[in-house]
Amino acid sequence: MIGGVAMMEQCGYILAILQENRVETATKVQEILTQNGCNIRVRLGLHDAGLESCSNSGMILLQICGEKAEAENLLMTLKAVPHVKAKLMSLDF
């Protein structure tokens, strides 16, 4: 049964990704996320958008399920992309 604490144990990592140049990095970042899609439970993309302009930087927040090694591998793969910063956080309640 997945619920409450059990769910957090299985999906207890948050990965924050900062893209400093979305035009250059979006395709590669999307490819990496697609390859790791089975471990991504939630994805939230944040950037300044409007009718007159759209920011070239943005942040993606992911809830990661699986083993810590899988989350760390995704982290290192993303950090290897130029203009991309990433940080892994563990939710330990």
Give short role names for the model-derived ranges.
Residues 2-93:
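Long, contiguous binding/interaction regions
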